From Swiss-Prot:
Its cofactor is Ca(2+). GO terms for biological process: arachidonate secretion; lipid catabolic process; negative regulation of T cell proliferation; phospholipid metabolic process. The keyword S-adenosyl-L-methionine does not apply. This is Basic phospholipase A2 daboxin P. It comes from Daboia russelii. SUPFAM superfamilies: Phospholipase A2, PLA2 (SSF48619). It catalyses: a 1,2-diacyl-sn-glycero-3-phosphocholine + H2O = a 1-acyl-sn-glycero-3-phosphocholine + a fatty acid + H(+).
Amino acid sequence: SLLEFGKMILEETGKLAIPSYSSYGCYCGWGGKGTPKDATDRCCFVHDCCYGNLPDCNNKSKRYRYKKVNGAIVCEKGTSCENRICECDKAAAICFRQNLNTYSKKYMLYPDFLCKGELVC
């Protein structure tokens, strides 16, 4: 769920999901269109695509469990949906951490109308 995802983001990046990633660029937050603005925004695009591959799962509200083992996120065994959602969120949180050096405050609260075009997963 968004609760676990937010916790993962904080643990991996030291940033609060809201406001840091809730409306960043063209893809972080609800929906998305256009060309990702930077590597962090591309993390969100890939995360959206990952969720898009789980049409039968309630991605944003489905709770799951994970733990940290030697600093690494490990998704705990749950239902198929829980496991797959956790893996999508884990990949995004790690992607955010790997791209912290290019995170730019200018893309926070980025206006949707500046996001043009369509990308296909």
